[in-house]
Amino acid sequence: MKRITDIAELRKVQTGILDDIHRFCTANGIMYFLSCGTLIGAVRHKGYIPWDDDLDLYMPRKDYDRFVKLYTDAGGRYRVLDPKKEKNYFYTFAKVVDTRTLLVETETEGYQIGVYVDIFPVDYVSDNEAERQRIFKRKRLLYKIRRCKISKRNYLKSALAYYCYKMLPVTVGMLNGMIERMVVRREPTNTVANMTEAGPSVKGCMPAKDIEGDVDIEFEGKMYKTMAGYKDYLSRTYGDYMKLPPVDQRASRLTGPTATSRKTANSIKKKKKRFRHKRKEKPGNGHCPAFLVLSQLTPGHEILLIPHS
């Protein structure tokens, strides 16, 4: 059994997924873009941001729909997780996972998936800023309810609101459907945005012309694709994206990986009373990792990423 013990090994798994996505999209005329922190890393570091450990892609909605419908990996190693088809899937966007790995997301009741690359659809939004704000506010409310449904932690200021939301007679699937119907706008406008996360703020919007074409960009020694208007997108969304953030804000999204076998993971799940959850983050930096390490009461037996044959 090969252990994933450092960030370099995790990145190797992720870039393997990215390579296969690039292969498939190139062969099938599907447009994709490096985005978010992945794009900042490509521009500023020609690879990962040094402390980053995830990969994000954008696809125009039509390309995204084609991708989740058609994507196949001839070797059977990778598969796409489609929010419309996966049972108990908590996200409103797709992920491509390496099926040889297991990643335990303890924040959401121990949900288990493989190491992944996130794929976000980019949708048309209203050209009117006031209307966009109204949609964003309604969408954020649905996301609050949805997060209360899936999370063990109360992220709201009011405990009463948290439990009221959690007890509403709606499923996560129903909420995902409501969010998609709200954000998917088929008629073209001059403005687009990633609408599938709790954000974006209005500054996350961009001119539709910015994603009408793509350009090559280097990432970890290989060439991939990003949107033609990537400089405007980065400036609008992140400000001075070439400037490094303060040291105390350089936190990874996934907590540093350790590994064990799938058998051990299943044993952990069955004997969860013997375990406690431990947050791995520097206090005071405002960072809330999406994945928490499930830690055994006995020191030295932590689990996050589990490779298996």
Task: Kindly give the residue locations of the regions a language model identified.
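Conserved catalytic core of two-metal-ion nucleotidyltransferases
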Residues: 2-26, 68-127, 147, 151, ...
